[in-house]
Structures are given as C-alpha cells and as structure tokens.
C-alpha cells in the first residue's frame, strides 16, 4: 500500500470522526415543522441528544439540558449510546492507524504494519456503522411521524442539520476505513537458488611428484 493512499484513508477517517463529534454535540437533530397552525409560531424548537433549544423570532436562544434520559424518545436514547461508542471506537482506530503507519517506527516489520492498518480500517468501518444506524433510525422516525395523521401538527418535526452531519461523518469513515483495509501485507520474496560452480582438479604435470608413487601399488 502506498503512503499516499494510507494518508488519504487516515485523513478521511479523521474528518469523519470529527464530524461525528459535531453531530453528537449539535442540538439540531429535530427541528420544528412549520405546517398547519404552527406556521404562525414565533419560535423554533431544536432537539438534540443532550439538550433542546428554543429560538425566538427576535434571535434570542435558550437551551436546556434534558433533566432525565427517560425524557428522550426511544430513537434518541439509542443514538446517545451508539454515537458515543462510535466516537470512542474511532479514536481507538486512529491510535491503531498511527501505530501501523509507514511513517512511524512503532513497528518495524512491514507485514505487521499492514495487518495493523487493516485492523484500524475495520475499526473505522464499525464506527461508521454505529453512526449511520442511529442517524437513519431518527430520520425514519421523523418522516414516519410527519406523515402520520394521528400526530398533532405541533408535535411534528423535520430533519435537522445534525442528521446530515451524521450521514456525512458515516460516509467519510466508510471511505477512509475502506482505503485502510486495502493495505495488503507484502509478499514473501522468493530468492533463486545459488548456483555452485565446481572447478575440475588440475592435472599433475609430467615432472611433478604425486602423493602416492606408482611403486606403492606394486
């Protein structure tokens, strides 16, 4: 695997990891839907994983942290846990990628480096899935409630910027992890057998005495 491809994969995965952190902190997973009687509402409600915010028409914003985890919908409760695990898993994957990077000397063997890089890629892929699942689940819940006639218009929400950031983060981590998984261990070098050249013994000259004289055989 070339160093350029490895750097590209690691960079994309790091961007996805940072985007996941932004997605986790952004209080804009759900936004007030302006339909029906809510069109004349002079405030906008944002709902995130950790707090909800109310933005007045004057531009004043007030945010409040959730008092209890049970106050959250089921999809946001699961999203909290999965997104946090995704961030921690991607952070561990980044450390593994640095250990197996070609520009570091933590590991000397090229084959071991390639295997470590593949492990880092798998960790980033798992982190991407842990981000993609809660984001898609929350988006599905929002769309389902939006078109449900039994849900009052005041309780209907639209998809916020946090969901789009989450999808972008998952895509970056998937692409970066896939590039890191392309790191193949180097093949064993095959050496050609050494040819041994035998030289013929020199024949003794006519006047040269040999180790054994002919008279010894008589």
From Swiss-Prot:
Signal peptide: none annotated. GO terms for molecular function: cell-cell adhesion mediator activity; identical protein binding; structural molecule activity. Disulfide bonds: none annotated. InterPro entries: Claudin, Claudin3, Claudin_CS, PMP22/EMP/MP20/Claudin. PROSITE patterns: CLAUDIN. The modification Phosphoserine is found at residues 199, 209. Residues 217-218 are annotated as: Interactions with TJP1, TJP2 and TJP3. One of its GO terms (biological process) is response to hypoxia. It is found in: Cell junction, Tight junction; Cell membrane. Residues 1-8, 102-115, 181-218 are cytoplasmic. The chain crosses the membrane at residues 9-29, 81-101, 116-136, 160-180. Keywords: Cell junction, Cell membrane, Membrane, Phosphoprotein, Tight junction, Transmembrane, Transmembrane helix. Residues 30-80, 137-159 are extracellular. GO terms for cellular component: apicolateral plasma membrane; bicellular tight junction; lateral plasma membrane; plasma membrane; protein-containing complex. It is a multi-pass membrane protein. The modification Phosphotyrosine is found at residue 198. Plays a major role in tight junction-specific obliteration of the intercellular space, through calcium-independent cell-adhesion activity. Can form homo- and heteropolymers with other CLDN. Homopolymers interact with CLDN1 and CLDN2 homopolymers. Interacts in cis (within the same plasma membrane) with CLDN19. Directly interacts with TJP1/ZO-1, TJP2/ZO-2 and TJP3/ZO-3. Belongs to the claudin family. This is Claudin-3. It comes from Canis lupus familiaris (Dog). The gene is CLDN3.
């Amino acid at each position: 695997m070339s160093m350029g491809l490895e750097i590209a994969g690691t960079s994309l995965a790091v961007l996805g990891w940072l985007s996941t952190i932004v997605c986790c902190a952004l209080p804009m997973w759900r936004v007030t839907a302006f339909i029906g009687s809510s069109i004349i509402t002079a405030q906008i409600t944002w709902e995130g994983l950790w707090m909800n915010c109310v933005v007045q028409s004057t531009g004043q914003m007030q945010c409040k942290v959730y008092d209890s985890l049970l106050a959250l919908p089921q999809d946001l409760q699961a999203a909290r846990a999965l997104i946090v695990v995704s961030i921690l898993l991607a952070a561990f994957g980044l450390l593994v990628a640095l250990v197996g990077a070609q520009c570091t000397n933590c590991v000397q063997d090229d084959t071991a480096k390639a295997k470590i890089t593949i492990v880092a890629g798998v960790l980033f892929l798992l982190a991407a899935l842990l981000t993609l699942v809660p984001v898609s689940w929350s988006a599905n819940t929002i769309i389902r409630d939006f078109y449900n006639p039994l849900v009052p218009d005041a309780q209907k929400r639209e998809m916020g910027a946090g969901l789009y950031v989450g999808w972008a983060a998952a895509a970056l981590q998937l692409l970066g992890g896939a590039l890191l998984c392309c790191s193949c261990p180097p093949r064993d070098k095959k050496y050609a057998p050494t040819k041994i050249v035998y030289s013929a013994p020199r024949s003794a000259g006519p006047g040269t005495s040999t180790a054994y004289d002919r008279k010894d055989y008589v």
